[in-house]
């Protein structure tokens, strides 16, 4: 594989003479210094990059600096790297689609005369679409967001505008946010933002540090713009040109915002929408409702493996890869990408999607027919955009035509369905398809193509305007054919004069240099040499023969070339005219693309549900104010899809007042993390409108999923594992509501055992007593299981805390620990670690000491401060004074209660830490005369 890569991406030789090199060096020095810009120079057959860009490319993509060459000499030498066209596509895709830290510039020219012809950034890839998607589908829609924050009295109001250049949509929003910017983060995730426009001056304020962190968590490129660009001047006239339809509703919409309008002004300036007249009258504008979808932050997206990652071993590792099982066209894949970031909260719309999926699951014949027809549908959205940008031609129009003529087959398949959901299928798809394909819409487009394009030539791979479409073109075609006939007659006449066989001895060629010429082999040349020198003009003598002409052939050839040039020019004019006419159908094709892409995604959901070895079920969906989350026989869809896994299903019953808050304990690698994540994934799938991997499921709609799972070190940002845990947990404490779903895994590992336990206990109490959200809390702190007993004693509690554990079996004969991966009620046996050490043949002295120390710690465990001796089991006798133990335990319990009362969701992190330090200092003072309590400090 490496050999093939090297073969395809060989380093082209950098060929510049001294004069060209000097001219280029002079130009290169005039370029402004921009550390984010990666500049490429088109040298016709290959590209080059220079200076720091060349070093970056050599190290990042060639993985060696031996690829570098020096342009010039001495102190003026400039490091350079040459790049093949294949490699340029690879690099451009990585810079614009995968990374978020560079812009791309492409220059054309020679010597010292170069001009910038293309610029691109992660949020604005339009100029490079022909390169990025020449051999790959466009799976995501890049969105540029502009934000204008206002800080006042410790609060922040965000004005936000965004543009989706693929779907031609502008959006506005304005909302209050907390210090962790949870609303902004979930909005960026939902929109799929790749780049964020931000006022340069605002970035210098202390308040913006957390805002910048939020943007970085979402992998969004930050582009600072001068503050004077964030003004709403001339917005009315700009929007009047851009937005389709009546301007009055647009004015009413925009007038309702204070901060979003400056953000929109900067966005229009940055995206240069007004510089392209093709955009005029083609955009829609809408209010973006941050509560319109389930909120997902970057931590939840990462924890639930929603989107694909470069590290995935196969596509089934991510939810997108799994559910993108049979999406055929790029527009369907892009819609799925968007849906997974925007799960629904509208009960009726969720049920409608589920009805359609159920229809497709139950009607295998309908599903297969529709899938076969959709396979022949092209990416309508991309074809349309290429035509609108005048980068497409007849080939794009033909693909639209071939897609359009498949619609009657799709309609027929739907008309034949008479099942339970026939009326829904008719309303949702059939009637809309009939309206779109009538004679006033796509019927007219089909007529246009059939009368303007020579469809017979498609078999030869030629895309041409039909000569019958235009009288001038028809006349030129007749002239061309007449001249072709005259040239062939001259060919025959000349063969008779020279006594040579037509096409065997005397051939008629068309050369790029000479036009129409006669050719004979060198063997035949001596036979006609005398006539050749007196009656003809010899043009070229080579091994393949002698090329010659005469005045008649040259005259006819020149006339023929002139007519061909006129014919091509007329063809081009007519193609441009047809393309312009086709773009008038943009709105119809946009509606068609939306219809077909939705059908494509829901068919993919049905294919997944029907093809899985263990069936999926349709979830019962209830409102967020009622019902529980009950999953019977639930499975993790991505884990069970791996070839090497025999998945053990588990039940999960998050029930109000009984088990709304679940503490899950058990040995490492026992399945705790998989279990709690699969619940989050299943809820997300259900609210997207998919069947779920369960035997039976009932789900109360959630407005948000929060996940704190497996934080890693972020040293490059100066953030430790523990700090990352705390930051993510702070987002949960501030942003969660009783309608959210919370998933927390192994909180408190990055600090001391007692600090970690104290934090875990306090966070649990806060979530139970204040947030009251359904929560799955996997932990290695077995003492937390006492929370269930403590919570049951609180009067008026409606949450319900329950203990669950993942089970394991120790075989005393084989000395093997077997994970059973079953989640069962109750707390976990805490002795697995020492058993495993014993069976691993640890020295007996080490095992004995471990048991002794474990017993000591059990005496001093935090649970002894919470529940009585009878409930916590028998304790080893100890020498501490009972009064001292009682006094110390009471003080420790007071500390934990005070800690739990801290309003973490309303305090800045530094203030919270300061308050904890003060409490700890007070505790240490009180412990000075208590030996038992000092053992914990």
Swiss-Prot record:
Keyword list, A-Z: ATP-binding, DNA damage, DNA repair, DNA-binding, Nucleotide-binding, Nucleus
Gene3D superfamilies in the record: 1.10.1420.10, DNA repair protein MutS, domain I, MutS, connector domain, P-loop containing nucleotide triphosphate hydrolases
Record-listed ATP binding positions: 666-673
Swiss-Prot/TrEMBL induction comment: By UV-B.
Basic and acidic residues compositional bias, start-end: 871-888
GO cellular component: nucleus; plasma membrane
Predominant place of localization: nucleus
SMART domains in UniProt: MUTSac (SM00534), MUTSd (SM00533)
Compartments, record wording: Nucleus
Alphabetized GO MF terms: ATP binding; ATP-dependent DNA damage sensor activity; damaged DNA binding; mismatched DNA binding
Record note on quaternary structure: Heterodimer consisting of MSH2-MSH6 (MutS alpha), MSH2-MSH3 (MutS beta) and MSH2-MSH7 (MutS gamma).
NCBIfam families tied to this protein: PRK05399.1
Entry protein name: DNA mismatch repair protein MSH2
Organism name: Arabidopsis thaliana (Mouse-ear cress)
């Amino acid at each position: 594989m490496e050999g093939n890569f090297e073969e395809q991406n060989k380093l082209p030789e950098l060929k510049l003479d001294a004069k060209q090199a000097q001219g280029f060096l002079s130009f290169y020095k005039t370029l402004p210094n921009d550390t984010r810009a990666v500049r490429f120079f088109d040298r016709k057959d290959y590209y080059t990059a220079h200076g720091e860009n060349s070093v970056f490319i050599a190290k990042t993509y060639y993985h060696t600096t031996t690829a570098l060459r020096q342009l010039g000499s001495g102190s003026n030498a400039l490091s350079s790297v040459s790049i093949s066209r294949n490699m340029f596509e690879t690099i451009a895709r990585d810079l614009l689609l995968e990374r978020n830290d560079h812009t791309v510039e492409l220059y054309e020219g020679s010597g010292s005369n170069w001009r910038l012809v293309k610029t691109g950034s992660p949020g604005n890839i339009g100029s490079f679409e022909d390169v990025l998607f020449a051999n790959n589908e466009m799976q995501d829609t890049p969105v540029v967001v502009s934000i204008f924050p206002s800080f006042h009295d410790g609060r922040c109001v965000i004005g936000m505008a965004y543009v989706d250049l693929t779907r031609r949509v502008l959006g506005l929003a304005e909302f209050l946010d907390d210090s962790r910017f949870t609303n902004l983060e979930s909005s960026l995730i939902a929109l799929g933002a790749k780049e964020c426009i931000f006022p340069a001056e605002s970035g210098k304020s202390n308040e913006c540090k957390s805002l910048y962190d939020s943007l970085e968590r979402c992998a969004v490129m930050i582009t600072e713009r001068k503050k004077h660009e964030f003004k709403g001047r001339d917005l009315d006239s700009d929007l009047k040109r851009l937005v389709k339809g009546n301007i009055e509703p647009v004015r009413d919409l925009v007038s309702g915002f204070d901060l979003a309008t400056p953000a929109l002004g900067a966005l229009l300036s940055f995206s240069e929408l007004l510089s392209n007249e093709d955009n005029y009258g083609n955009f829609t504008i809408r209010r973006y409702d941050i509560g319109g979808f389930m909120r997902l932050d970057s931590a939840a997206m990462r924890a639930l493996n929603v989107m694909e990652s470069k590290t995935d071993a196969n596509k089934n590792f991510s939810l997108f890869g799994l559910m993108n099982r049979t999406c055929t066209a790029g527009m369907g894949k892009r819609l799925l990408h968007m849906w997974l970031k925007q799960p629904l909260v509208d009960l009726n719309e969720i049920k409608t999607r589920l009805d359609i999926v159920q229809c497709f699951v139950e009607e295998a014949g309908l599903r297969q027919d529709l899938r076969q027809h959709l396979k022949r549908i092209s990416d309508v959205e991309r074809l349309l955009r290429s035509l609108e940008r005048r980068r497409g031609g007849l080939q794009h129009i033909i693909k639209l035509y071939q897609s359009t003529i498949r619609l009657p087959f799709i309609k027929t398949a739907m008309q034949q369905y008479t099942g339970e959901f026939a009326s829904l299928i008719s309303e949702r798809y059939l009637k809309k398809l009939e309206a779109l394909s009538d004679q006033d819409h796509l019927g007219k487009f089909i007529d246009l193509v059939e009368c303007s394009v020579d469809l017979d030539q498609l078999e030869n791979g030629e895309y041409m305007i039909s000569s019958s479409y235009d009288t001038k073109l028809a006349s030129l075609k007749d002239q061309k054919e007449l001249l072709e006939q005259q040239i062939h007659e001259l060919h025959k006449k000349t063969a008779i004069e020279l006594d040579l066989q037509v096409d065997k001895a005397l051939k008629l060629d068309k050369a790029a240099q000479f036009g129409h010429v006669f050719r004979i082999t060198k063997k035949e040349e001596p036979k006609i040499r005398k006539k050749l020198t007196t009656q003809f003009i010899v043009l070229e003598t080579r091994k393949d023969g002698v090329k010659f002409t005469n005045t008649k052939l040259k005259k006819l050839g020149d006339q023929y070339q002139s007519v061909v040039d006129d014919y091509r020019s007329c063809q081009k004019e007519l193609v441009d005219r047809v393309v312009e006419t086709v773009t008038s159908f943009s709105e119809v094709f946009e509606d068609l693309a939306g219809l077909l892409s939705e059908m494509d995604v829901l068919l993919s959901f049905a294919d997944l549900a029907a093809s899985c070895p263990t069936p999926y079920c349709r979830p019962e969906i209830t409102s967020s104010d009622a019902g529980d989350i009950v999953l019977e026989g639930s499975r993790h869809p991505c884990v069970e899809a791996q070839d090497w896994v025999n998945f053990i299903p588990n039940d999960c019953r998050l029930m109000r007042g009984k088990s709304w808050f679940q503490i899950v304990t058990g040995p490492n690698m026992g399945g705790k993390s998989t279990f709690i994540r699969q619940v989050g994934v299943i809820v997300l799938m259900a609210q997207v409108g998919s069947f779920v991997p369960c035997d039976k499921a009932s789900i109360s709609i959630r407005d948000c999923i929060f996940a704190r799972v497996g934080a890693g070190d972020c040293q490059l940002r100066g953030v430790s594992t523990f700090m990352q845990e705390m930051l993510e947990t702070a987002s949960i404490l501030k942003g969660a509501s009783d309608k959210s779903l919370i998933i927390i895994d192994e909180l408190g590992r990055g600090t001391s055992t007692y600090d970690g336990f104290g934090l875990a206990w306090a966070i649990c109490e806060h979530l139970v007593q204040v947030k009251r959200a359904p929560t799955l809390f996997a932990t290695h702190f077995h003492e937390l299981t006492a929370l269930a007993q403590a919570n049951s004693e609180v009067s008026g509690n409606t949450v319900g805390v329950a203990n669950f554990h993942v089970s394991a079996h120790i075989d005393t004969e084989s000395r093997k620990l077997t994970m059973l991966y079953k989640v069962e009620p109750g707390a976990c046996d805490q002795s697995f670690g020492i058993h495993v050490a014993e069976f691993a043949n640890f020295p007996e002295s080490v095992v004995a000491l471990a048991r002794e120390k474990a017993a000591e710690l059990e005496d001093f465990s935090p649970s002894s401060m919470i529940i009585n001796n009878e409930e916590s089991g028998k304790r080893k006798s100890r020498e501490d004074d009972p009064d001292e133990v009682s006094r110390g335990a009471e003080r420790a319990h007071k500390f934990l209660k005070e800690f739990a009362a801290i309003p973490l969701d309303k305090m800045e992190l530094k203030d919270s830490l300061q308050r904890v330090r003060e409490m700890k200092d007070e505790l240490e003072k009180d412990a000075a005369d208590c030996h038992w309590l000092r053992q914990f400090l």
